[in-house]
């Protein structure tokens, strides 16, 4: 009889334990219904929607993700702006005292992408639209100087900005340096409107050979009857002239120009120094002379490229033969060469 009684008690204990486990399971309910945990750089409101029992607590391991509300139905948090280049992650944990769930909060880095080859926008005197590509995570401001707003405006679109340029009837070159900024990032653009014939005249100048700086005096640019241009006295006191064509509203000087006899029995060649510092004689390769606007609003004419792949400078090379096959030496290397009116740079 006692043995049967002990068996009966054992069965009751098992039933009681099972009942306790069922009760505990029902009291520790923590079901996830919906989440919003991925964010752009601009940040925003996130949430974890749930069904739960018990006392809900939440914790996050970074200060840029801030808990706003915690209750049995929802955990709400706010992700701050990310102005950095890199994306970032946070860990959010939710618990009801028995069960715990963990969530990764992901935020992408800030984007400010612009065309590095679009910083110089040169155009003739006709009314025109100059498009540039620009992508930004944040809203950006476009600052056109007050003195240029009468003739220069802009329109934003999904791909970037369209600069709207009115017809130039002033009879002189005009330009503006436009700053575009988003948070702590920015880009500057030069918009210059002019007639290419304004590059003709007599100019002073300066250049570097990579070691020292030198001055230039009375460099002359003339337009020919056939529409081409001649530049003379770039080698001060020597009679050599460089030929150029008007391309993209600049004067383009082709490589490989045979300038003729140099010191009786030698020959002189105009060649281009490429961006990777090779001497180039291919006539299809050119270096351009065009206006650049200084911060004080004045203009200089620069033998400088707009793109990173544009030529680094130009060089006059001495050869033994008229076919320019046997080079002897460099006569002069021109880097960062600019031309200007005498009263511009003192």
Where do the language-model regions lie?
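Ser/Thr/Gly/Pro-rich, low-complexity flexible regions
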Residues: 192-346
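A short beta-strand micro-motif common to beta-rich folds, especially ectodomain repeats
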Residues: 86-98, 171-184
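Proline-enriched interdomain boundary motifs that mark the N-terminal boundary
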Residues: 27-35, 110-119
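Short, hydrophobic beta-strand segments
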Residues: 77-82, 134, 163-169
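Short beta-strand edge segments in extracellular beta-sheet folds
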Residues: 104-112, 122, 188-198
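Short, solvent-exposed loop/linker segments at the N-terminal edge
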Residues: 38-43, 120-126
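Surface-exposed binding patches on compact interaction domains or structured appendages
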Residues: 45-76, 135-162
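Bacterial Sec-dependent N-terminal signal peptides
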Residues: 2-5, 10-42, 97, 102-104, ...
């Amino acid at each position: 009889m006692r043995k049967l009684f002990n068996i009966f008690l054992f069965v009751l204990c098992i039933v009681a334990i099972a009942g306790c486990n069922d009760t505990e399971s029902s009291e520790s309910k923590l079901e996830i219904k919906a989440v919003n945990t991925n964010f752009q750089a601009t940040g925003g409101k996130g949430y974890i929607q749930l069904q739960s029992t018990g006392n809900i607590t939440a914790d996050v391991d970074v200060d840029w993700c801030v808990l706003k509300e915690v209750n049995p139905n929802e955990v709400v948090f706010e992700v701050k702006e990310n102005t950095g280049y890199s994306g970032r992650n946070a860990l959010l944990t939710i618990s009801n005292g028995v069960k715990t769930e963990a969530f990764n909060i992901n935020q992408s880095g800030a984007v400010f992408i612009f065309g590095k080859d679009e910083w110089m926008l040169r155009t003739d005197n006709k009314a025109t639209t100059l498009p540039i590509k620009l992508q930004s995570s944040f809203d950006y401001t476009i600052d056109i100087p007050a003195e240029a707003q009468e003739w220069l405006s802009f329109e934003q679109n999904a791909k970037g900005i369209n600069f709207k340029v009115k017809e130039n009837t002033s009879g002189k070159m005009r330009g503006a340096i436009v700053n575009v900024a988003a948070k702590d990032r920015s880009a500057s653009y030069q918009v210059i409107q002019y007639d290419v014939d304004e590059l003709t005249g007599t100019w002073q100048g300066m250049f570097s050979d990579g070691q020292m700086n030198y001055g230039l005096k009375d460099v002359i640019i003339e337009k020919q009857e056939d529409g081409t241009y001649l530049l003379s006295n770039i080698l001060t006191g020597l009679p050599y002239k460089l030929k150029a064509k008007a391309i993209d509203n600049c004067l383009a000087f082709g490589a490989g120009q045979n300038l003729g006899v140099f010191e009786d029995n030698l020959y002189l060649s105009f060649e281009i120094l490429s961006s990777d510092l090779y001497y180039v004689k291919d006539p299809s390769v050119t270096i351009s002379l065009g206006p650049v606007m200084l911060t004080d609003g004045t203009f200089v004419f620069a033998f400088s490229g707009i793109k990173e792949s544009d030529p680094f400078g130009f060089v006059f090379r001495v050869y033994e033969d008229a076919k320019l096959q046997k080079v002897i030496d460099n006569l002069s290397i021109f880097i960062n060469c600019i031309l200007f009116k005498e009263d511009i740079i003192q």
